[in-house]
Amino acid sequence: MNTSQAEIELDLDLQLAIENSQLPSKQNFELWVRTALPKTMAEAELTIRIVDEAESQELNSTYRGKDKPTNVLSFPFEAPPEIEIPLLGDLIICAPVVELEALQQNKPLQAHWAHMVVHGCLHLLGYDHINDAEAEEMESLETQLVESLGFNNPYKEQ
C-alpha cells in the first residue's frame, strides 16, 4: 500500500449523477485514489463522476467511438509544460456497469469499485493497455495496488 497516502493533499470532487444505495463512501473513494497515486506526489486534484448507462454511453461514443456504456472513462488533464498544477483529470464511472460486471465476474462489489478507481487513476497518471507490454505492466501494478487494499487479484478468475 502507499505508505505515505495520508501525506498526499487530495482534493477529490465526487459527483453523483445517479441515485444508488450501493455506492461506496467518499472515504473509500479517497482511500482508493490515494493508494493509486505515487508516493512522491504531494498533492492531487481530480473529479470522479458516477453516472448511469445513458451518460456513459454518450461519452464513450463521443470520445472513443464506442456506442455502448463502459465501466470507467479517464480524461487526463494536460497542462502546458511551463505550468505545474496538481490537477490529474476526471474519471467517469458507470455504476450499473460496475455492478453488472461484479456480478458476472463473481467479485465483491466493493472490490470491483476499488479496481475501477485504481484502473482509472493509473490512466490519469499515463498508464495504458494498448499493447501487450503496456497491458502487462498496468495489470501488474493494478493487482499490486488492489491487493494492498485487501482485495483479491482483479484479473484472477474467481
Swiss-Prot record:
Protein localization: Cytoplasm
Family: Belongs to the endoribonuclease YbeY family.
Taxonomic lineage: Bacteria, Pseudomonadati, Pseudomonadota, Gammaproteobacteria, Alteromonadales
Needed cofactors: Zn(2+)
Ranges annotated as spanning the membrane: none
Entry keywords, A to Z: Cytoplasm, Endonuclease, Hydrolase, Metal-binding, Nuclease, Ribosome biogenesis, rRNA processing, Zinc
Gene Ontology terms, MF aspect: metalloendopeptidase activity; RNA endonuclease activity; zinc ion binding
Purpose: Single strand-specific metallo-endoribonuclease involved in late-stage 70S ribosome quality control and in maturation of the 3' terminus of the 16S rRNA.
UniProt KW Signal keyword: no
Top-level taxon: Bacteria
Major site of localization recorded for this protein: cytoplasm
Pfam families: YbeY
Keyword Metal-binding among UniProt keywords: yes
GO biological process: rRNA processing
Positions with a binding annotation for Zn(2+): 119, 123, 129
A GO cellular component entry from the record: cytoplasm
Signal peptide: none
Protein name: Endoribonuclease YbeY
EC number: 3.1.-.-
Cofactor note: Binds 1 zinc ion.
InterPro entries xrefs: MetalPrtase_cat_dom_sf_prd, YbeY, YbeY_CS
